[in-house]
Amino acid sequence: MNDQFKTQVNAKYAFYRTHYVNNDDKLIEVDNLYKQREVYVSTANMYTIFPFWDVSMSYDFQWNEMKADMYGFVFPTRFTTLLSIATALRLGKVKLQGSGLATFVNDQVKEGPAPKARQILTPAVFLSYKPFDKHDFSLRAFYKKTFRMPTFNDLYYADMGNSKLDPEYVTQYNLGIVYQKQWGNKLFRHFKIQADGYYNYVKDKIIAYPKGQQFRWTMLNLGKVKIRGVDISTETMINPWKDLFITMKVQYTYQKAQDYTDPSDNYYKDQIPYIPWHSGSAIAQASYKGWDLNYSFIYVGERYNQQENIKYNYTQPWYTSDISLSKEFKMKFGSLKASLEVNNLLSQDYDVILNYPMPKRNYRASLTVEL
């Protein structure tokens, strides 16, 4: 287009096939085949009114269809339309962004009553302020509303889906700081630290937890959930000698996610299922002439596997280490990347979800071609 007007168009088609078979004679035998199709198109346009002021508009359309070979299946079809208008202002040390997203969702079924059509407008406002000229330090804040429709998996998978699920509405408040510094040809090349505190109010939060079989989960809405949390992350890069760069990242999250639906419930103000209070990760990467060596450590703290925070529902923390080595080769037709991964390096026993043991030490090799 030109320097003032820019546009982008995307399109996607996807097909998913899920075949679930359970021949355990102690349980109900199941042999279900699900097929899903998705078509997605979007266009985004941005116009620069002044060097300090941009406006944009985007339009998205998505079509989803689900079929299954079960008696009485409803064969749902969903039409989703998204229309967004946004603006961004840069006024000296202040950056201000605002947007409004209109969402229209229409579900149709071949059997039973038609689901209710949904129309919702969700605004967002973002603000950042950089108080110092000589230091890359900024304060940021945002207010945002979001809306999430239950997926077809949430609604219609047999003995898992809940066709009565309501959409999830979230109101988010966030305050944060960011500081970063760049150095030239020195040992330390880059350092960044950021911290955010947030409060989310969630109406009809959609959660899932297993009934005891791998494919069968309970889907339900929690009427009112309040989430308070802190995210802290740091990143640094060093260059000990020519062509060798070492990057280290550390991230920590504290999250208190409580169910405030009904004061008469035994689990009123309890932490909601499978949300840990503490979690974090550490990543180290060494890069040298196209070779990359990566190590990652993930920690998930204690949590509960049901709505009541009692000893019987307590779930132990878990942590794991992974390592990978990759090499990128430049070819005439593009590039070729070969990688080898060792996951769960210490071969530990752990469950992300109760009674769903994760693999012990395992290996994966891959080749990726880019044209």
Identify the meaning behind each predicted range.
Residues N2-K6, T48-D54, G92-V94, P131-F137, ...:
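Short loop/turn motifs that connect adjacent beta-strands in outer-membrane beta-barrel proteins
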Residues M1-D3, V41-Y47, L83-L89, V125-Y129, ...:
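Residues on the lipid-exposed face of transmembrane beta-strands in outer-membrane beta-barrel proteins
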Residues K93, H190-Y201, L220-N305, S335, ...:
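Gram-negative outer-membrane beta-barrel transporters
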Residues Q4, Q8-Y20, F132, S138-K144, ...:
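Membrane-embedded beta-barrel scaffold of Gram-negative outer-membrane proteins
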Residues Y13-R17, F61-K67, L91-K93, A102-Q108, ...:
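Transmembrane beta-strands of outer-membrane beta-barrel pores
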